[in-house]
Amino acid sequence: MLYKGDTLYLDWLEDGIAELVFDAPGSVNKLDTATVASLGEAIGVLEQQSDLKGLLLRSNKAAFIVGADITEFLSLFLVPEEQLSQWLHFANSVFNRLEDLPVPTIAAVNGYALGGGCECVLATDYRLATPDLRIGLPETKLGIMPGFGGSVRMPRMLGADSALEIIAAGKDVGADQALKIGLVDGVVKAEKLVEGAMAILRQAINGDLDWKAKRQPKLEPLKLSKIEATMSFTIAKGMVAQTAGKHYPAPITAVKTIEAAARFGREEALNLENKSFVPLAHTNEARALVGIFLNDQYVKGKAKKLTKDVETPKQAAVLGAGIMGGGIAYQSAWKGVPVVMKDINDKSLTLGMTEAAKLLNKQLERGKIDGLKLAGVISTIHPTLDYAGFDRVDIVVEAVVENPKVKKAVLAETEQKVRPDTVLASNTSTIPISELANALERPENFCGMHFFNPVHRMPLVEIIRGEKSSDETIAKVVAWASKMGKTPIVVNDCPGFFVNRVLFPYFAGFSQLLRDGADFRKIDKVMEKQFGWPMGPAYLLDVVGIDTAHHAQAVMAAGFPQRMQKDYRDAIDALFDANRFGQKNGLGFWRYKEDSKGKPKKEEDAAVDDLLAEVSQPKRDFSEEEIIARMMIPMVNEVVRCLEEGIIATPAEADMALVYGLGFPPFHGGAFRWLDTLGSAKYLDMAQQYQHLGPLYEVPEGLRNKARHNEPYYPPVEPARPVGDLKTA
C-alpha cells in the first residue's frame, strides 16, 4: 500500500502501474475538502515514485464521485473572498499535479461523475466509462460555476459549443452522448471496465497511443478562430439570457469567463475561473440554491426514513377520472404501480384514458419510450364504471368534485368495497381531512393526498395527517408518492392544509391592491420580472380557474374568518359572476385563444377593465416595492403561522413545498430562506408599514421574537476553516 486515507487509497497494480481508488465510508464518494487534501497527499507519494509508468483512477462504489460535498458549501461560502480563493487555488494545484504526472493516466468511470467528480476525471488523459454513466457539471444550478478547472478543461477538450451547452445549463449527459462529444474515450460493460482501462494504459505506456498529445490541448489556449468564438459565445449568451434571466447570475458568468479565458493557457485561465467563482459563491442566489438542494435531500431522507418498514403499494386505484384522475393514473402506471380508474361517467373515463394516452404519446415523441413500452404502461390502467378489482387494491385516492358531501359519500361507499387494510386518501385541495374522515368506519386508514396540476410535472404531493390517521397509513401513502417520483411532504390538517392556506392570503393581497386601484397587468409584471414568480397572480388565477379560486376562497374564509373573511366584493367575485373562469372557458383576466400547438395564448381584453372598475377605486400607480411587499407579506405571515401551529414541521419542508408546489422563485430559496436573507427585523419594519390593511398584515408573535433577538429560521452556519487547517481524509 503506497498511501491510505479515510476516503481513498493508492496501491501498485503491476509493472509500474498504480491505482488510486476512491472508497469513502458510506454508500457514495464525495469530493469534500478532506478528500481533496488526501488526493493531494496521494499525488505527492506518486511524484516520488521513480518507477511509476501509469496511473489508473477508479471507484469502489456504484458511482465514481457524485460531486463535491454540498453540505460544506454554505460554510465555504461564508469565508472571506481571499480565503475562498486560496482554497480554490489549493484544490486546483492538486488537479494540476494529477494532470502533470510524467506518465499516462486514465479514469475508469462508473455511474455518476458530477461536478467535482467530473472535474477530477477531466484532469486525466483518458476516460473509459460504463453504460450507466452520468457525467456533467451541474454547478450553475447551485448558483455557482465549476471551480476545479471544469470551465477551463472541458472547452479545450470538447470545443466551445459542447462545453458551453453542458456548463451554462448545468447539464449531465449519458454514456452514448459523452462518447459522441469526446467527454469519454470509450464505453464498456461494467465487468470489463478495469480490464479495458488497463489495456488503454498499456498502449499509452508502450507508445501505441500518444498520451502527451492528448494532454497538450488542455494546457493551451482554446483553439477557436475569431469568427467561431464570436458565434459560439454570442449564441450562448443569448440562450442564457433567454432561459436563466437576470435572477440567475451563474450561467452568464460562466459563459463570459470561458470566453475571457479562451485566449490563455491553463494557469491564467484557472485564475480567471477562480476570480469569477468567488463572487458568485457570496451571492444570496448561491446560498438559496444550495439551500434548496440541501432541503431537497432532507425532505427525501425524511420520506425514506418514514417508509423504511413499509411495503410500497403494488396495486392502486383512482376514484374520479377526468384530467386530474387520468394524470394520477398515468403517473402511477408510468412508475410501475398498476391502477384501476373508476368513474360513474363513461365520458369522464374516456377523458381520463385520453389524458394518460396523451402523456405517454409525448414520451414516445421525445424518444423516451418505444411503442412496446407505451402499450405496456397503458395496459396497466384499468378503466371501470364499477368496483371490479377494488378488493385487490392496496391504496385508493379519491379525486372527485371538490364538494364535501360528494366526497364523503364516495369515500364511505368505497370503504365497503375494499379490504380492511386498504388505505383511502382524498385529493381534496381545501376540505379538512378530519371532516371527511367522519364519514368512515376506519378513519385511521384515511388521510389526504393533495396532488398539484399538472400531475406529471408538479413534483410536490402534500400528505395530510387527519386527527385519526395512523402512522402506518401516512407511511404507505408517502411510499406510493415516492414510488410515483414525487416529493411527499407530510403536513397536519387544517383548511387549505399548507400550500393553499398560504396561497390564498397572497391572492387576498392581490385583491386588495386591485381594490385600491392597482393595474393587474403591472402587478403580474412586477411579481414575474422583479420578484421572480413563474406567473403573476392574475395569470395564475386564470390557470387555476376563477371558479375554483372563488370556491376555495370561501372555504378558507370559513376556516379562518378572523383573517380571511373579507368585507368587500373583490375582483375574483366580479369575474366569477361574469362567468369568466380563466383558461378553462377562454375568459378570465385575459382572453385566451389556442396557438398553433393547441396551447392557450393570452390576449388583452378591454371588457375586464370595465368589470374591475365596479370593484376598484380609480386607477393609480404603485411602486414595485409596494406591490412586492403587499403581495408577499400576507403569504409569509401565514407560512410562519403554519410553522408555529405545527401544520408544517420545519422551515426546510415549508420552503420545499412552496418551491415545488407553487413555483416560489428558487433563487429566493423559499419563504424562510427569503426571510433569513432579508433579516427578520427588516421584514418586521416593512410589514408594520402595511398593518393598517388588516389582520393578514399583522406579523405573528414568533416572527416578532426572531426580529427582537436577531435570530434566523435556519440554523446558523460556521465559516469553513482556512486551507492551512485542512485535515486529510
Curated annotation (Swiss-Prot):
Domain of life: Bacteria
UniProt cross-references to Pfam families, sorted A to Z: 3HCDH (PF00725), 3HCDH_N (PF02737), ECH_1 (PF00378)
Keywords annotated in UniProt: Fatty acid metabolism, Isomerase, Lipid degradation, Lipid metabolism, Lyase, Multifunctional enzyme, NAD, Oxidoreductase
Region described as 3-hydroxyacyl-CoA dehydrogenase: 311-729
PROSITE patterns hit by this protein: 3HCDH, ENOYL_COA_HYDRATASE
Region spans: Disordered: 708-729
InterPro entries per record: 3-OHacyl-CoA_DH_CS, 3-OHacyl-CoA_DH_NAD-bd, 3HC_DH_C, 6-PGluconate_DH-like_C_sf, ClpP/crotonase-like_dom_sf, Enoyl-CoA_hyd/isom_CS, Enoyl-CoA_hydra/iso, FA_oxidation_alpha_subunit
Binding residue positions for substrate: D296, N500, Y660
Reaction it catalyzes: a (3S)-3-hydroxyacyl-CoA + NAD(+) = a 3-oxoacyl-CoA + NADH + H(+); a (3S)-3-hydroxyacyl-CoA = a (2E)-enoyl-CoA + H2O; a 4-saturated-(3S)-3-hydroxyacyl-CoA = a (3E)-enoyl-CoA + H2O; (3S)-3-hydroxybutanoyl-CoA = (3R)-3-hydroxybutanoyl-CoA
Site (Important for catalytic activity): E119, E139
This protein's pathway: Lipid metabolism; fatty acid beta-oxidation
An example Gene Ontology CC term for this record: fatty acid beta-oxidation multienzyme complex
GO MF, any single term: NAD+ binding
Signal peptide annotation: none
The protein's role, per its UniProt record: Involved in the aerobic and anaerobic degradation of long-chain fatty acids via beta-oxidation cycle. Catalyzes the formation of 3-oxoacyl-CoA from enoyl-CoA via L-3-hydroxyacyl-CoA. It can also use D-3-hydroxyacyl-CoA and cis-3-enoyl-CoA as substrate.
Self-association and partners: Heterotetramer of two alpha chains (FadB) and two beta chains (FadA).
Protein name (database record): Fatty acid oxidation complex subunit alpha
UniProt organism field: Escherichia coli O17:K52:H18 (strain UMN026 / ExPEC)
